[in-house]
Amino acid sequence: MAADQISVRPARAADRRSLAVLFAEVAQERDGIAAEPPIDVDGLAEHWRLDGTLVAVADGDLVGEIRVDPSWMGFGEIGMMVAASWRGRGVGSALVAAAIEWARGQGLHKLALQVFPHNKAAIALYRKFGFVEEGRLAAHVRRADGQLWDLIEMGLLL
């Protein structure tokens, strides 16, 4: 499926369960997001915040999500996840483009994010949209096995 067959729209209450399942699937990979299994899908679905959340839909399935958390300081912090089977197929690009448009519409002046240094595909995607590395948080995330992982901070002035 081409990127033009992927639709991005604001998340709805009916998406909460699919979002929680996607989150659990991405967490199971143990390398893209800080959360690790087990994930309480039912509890997560019940409390999933929809404000600023955009979802990517293909063939009627939710295949990705990006959320912009606006700060009182005028910037937005973003977090994104894409189903493994949909990576490299334009979902991430569609989500980032939509988030940038949404943030501009909200009057935000900047988007910021954190990404693991080993997540080269995500870093390349963000750079494609103009995000630049602004710093590194050393040993910032403690994994369940005791490993300490760095985070790269990236930002985009809108």
Where in the sequence are the language-model features?
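Conserved acetyl-CoA-binding loop-helix of GNAT-fold acetyltransferases
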Residues: 88-101, 105, 124-128
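Amphipathic alpha-helical recognition patches that constitute DNA-binding helices
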Residues: 18, 77, 81, 121
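Conserved catalytic-core motifs of GNAT/GCN5-like acyltransferases
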Residues: 110-115, 127, 132-148
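Terminal substrate-recognition subdomain of acyl/acetyltransferases
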Residues: 2, 149-158
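Acetyl-CoA-dependent GNAT
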Residues: 10-13, 24-85, 96-97, 102, ...
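Short glycine/proline-centered loop/turn elements that form peptide/ligand docking sites
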Residues: 96, 119-122, 139-144
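A short beta-loop-alpha structural element at the N-terminal edge
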Residues: 7-19
